[in-house]
């Protein structure tokens, strides 16, 4: 099988098998640690930008994003474009927080 035909999932599965068999090298460990740390840092940076955007909406409308999102989900807000954008940002931030929890082993924000 050519390297280009091997999917990322297959390559990760191969690494998992090597780890399970105790055949992982220190280089593999260091590389994976660096990769996870890099991905976590990228997620933190993206979350920081989103949190600044959320803070603008919170200041503009005098409401915490969590409270807004509960009301939005319950249909207690109108359909103005600001609210649609705010809701999307809340969802994006939640996904990034979940990603961080996975990347850092459950100790994310």
Where are the predicted features?
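Small, basic N-terminal interaction modules of short regulatory proteins
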Residues: 1-59, 63, 98-109
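Short His/Asp/Glu-rich catalytic/ion-coordination signatures at enzyme active sites or charged loops
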Residues: 35, 71-85
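Short E/K-rich amphipathic alpha-helical oligomerization segments
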Residues: 55-77
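Short, surface-exposed linear patches
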Residues: 71, 92-94, 109
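Short, compact, well-ordered microdomains
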Residues: 79-105
């Amino acid at each position: 099988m050519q390297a280009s035909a091997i999917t990322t999932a297959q390559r990760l599965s191969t690494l998992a098998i090597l780890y399970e068999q105790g055949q992982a090298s220190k280089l593999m460990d260091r590389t994976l640690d660096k990769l996870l740390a890099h991905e976590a840092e990228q997620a933190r940076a993206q979350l920081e930008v989103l949190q600044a955007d959320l803070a603008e909406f919170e200041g503009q409308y005098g409401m915490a994003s969590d409270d807004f999102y509960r009301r939005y989900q319950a249909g207690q807000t109108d359909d103005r474009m600001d609210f649609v954008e705010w809701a999307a940002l809340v969802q994006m931030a939640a996904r990034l927080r979940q990603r961080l929890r996975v990347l850092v082993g459950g100790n994310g924000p």
